[in-house]
């Protein structure tokens, strides 16, 4: 079963690497300040993201409409 096919799971997409600096500049943050997501997360595996990728997560909210979050994929500790 694809995890992303469930209606409660928000859309996850990989941000192109060349767009990451623009994202960081827009929010005036450093890469390591983004919330983290482990490379073993089922959705990370499904979208084939690797450590260092940034995922754009788009959620629907009944009060705010569409909201966007960004997370940095990190490697699971050995």
From Swiss-Prot:
It comes from the Archaea. It holds the Pfam family RNA_pol_Rpb5_C. Transmembrane segments: none annotated. GO terms for molecular function: DNA binding; DNA-directed RNA polymerase activity. Disulfide bonds: none annotated. Signal peptide: none annotated. One of its GO terms (biological process) is tRNA transcription by RNA polymerase III. It catalyses: RNA(n) + a ribonucleoside 5'-triphosphate = RNA(n+1) + diphosphate. InterPro entries: Arch_Rpo5/euc_Rpb5, RNA_pol_subH/Rpb5_C, RNA_pol_subH/Rpb5_CS, RPB5-like_sf. GO terms for cellular component: cytoplasm; DNA-directed RNA polymerase complex. Its EC number is 2.7.7.6. It is found in: Cytoplasm. Keywords: Cytoplasm, DNA-directed RNA polymerase, Nucleotidyltransferase, Transcription, Transferase. DNA-dependent RNA polymerase (RNAP) catalyzes the transcription of DNA into RNA using the four ribonucleoside triphosphates as substrates. NCBIfam families: PRK09570.1. Belongs to the archaeal Rpo5/eukaryotic RPB5 RNA polymerase subunit family. HAMAP family: RNApol_Rpo5_RPB5. Part of the RNA polymerase complex. This is DNA-directed RNA polymerase subunit Rpo5.
